[in-house]
């Protein structure tokens, strides 16, 4: 009796892939490989995360601490949002710093907003357990949630790359590093 070939199980997309569109900002502020990923929901809310190629997510890196204290007068933890129209939210530009990540090797990385809008919340869980940022960067290890202005919600993706474009950038980087070796 011949056995039927097993049908391959259909790949179920993750929650993030199902409900969010991934956008990428490579080399933020001109810093090589410091790439950010913006997860945009259909309701226009954007979740700021680190891209897979960010140096913090590479093997061997250990996060010592994370700080939302941007300057002496500005802390993203002081952001208090209330009401239907999200009063009290801090307004962010594309280059506004969200947090600083300090690694055990002395390296310091600043995570920027990448989108203009209001800061809805920051992820306080990564302050207490920084390893979440490396273990689950797209889900529990997110940096912040930003709500773009309604009028600008379509145009925020103009300076960002799609998943396919970002993969092409990654291939070019790999080819450039192997060519110089």
Swiss-Prot record:
GO terms for cellular component: dendrite; filopodium tip; growth cone; lamellipodium; nuclear speck; nucleus. Its main location: nucleus. It is found in: Nucleus speckle; Cell projection, Lamellipodium; Nucleus; Cell projection, Growth cone. The keyword Zinc does not apply. One of its GO terms (molecular function) is actin filament binding. Keywords: Actin-binding, Cell projection, Nucleus. Actin-binding protein that regulates actin polymerization, filopodia dynamics and increases the branching of proximal dendrites of developing neurons. Depletion of ABITRAM by siRNA or neutralizing antibodies results in cell death within a few hours. This is Protein Abitram. The gene is ABITRAM.
């Amino acid at each position: 009796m011949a056995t039927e070939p097993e049908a391959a199980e259909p790949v179920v997309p993750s929650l993030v892939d199902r409900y969010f569109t991934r956008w990428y900002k490579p080399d933020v502020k001109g810093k090589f490989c410091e790439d950010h990923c913006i997860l945009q929901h259909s309701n226009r809310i954007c979740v700021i995360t680190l891209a897979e190629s960010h140096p913090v997510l590479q093997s061997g890196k250990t996060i010592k601490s994370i700080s939302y204290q941007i300057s002496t007068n500005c802390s993203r933890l002081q952001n208090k949002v209330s009401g239907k129209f999200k009063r009290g939210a801090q307004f962010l530009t594309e280059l506004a710093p969200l947090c600083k990540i300090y690694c055990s090797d002395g390296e310091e990385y600043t995570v920027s907003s990448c989108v203009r809008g209001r800061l809805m919340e920051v992820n306080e869980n990564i302050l207490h357990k920084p390893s979440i940022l490396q273990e689950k960067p797209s889900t529990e290890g997110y940096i912040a949630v930003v709500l773009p202005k309604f009028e600008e919600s379509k145009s925020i993706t103009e300076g960002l790359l799609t998943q396919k474009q970002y993969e092409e950038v990654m291939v070019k980087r790999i080819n450039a590093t192997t060519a110089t070796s």
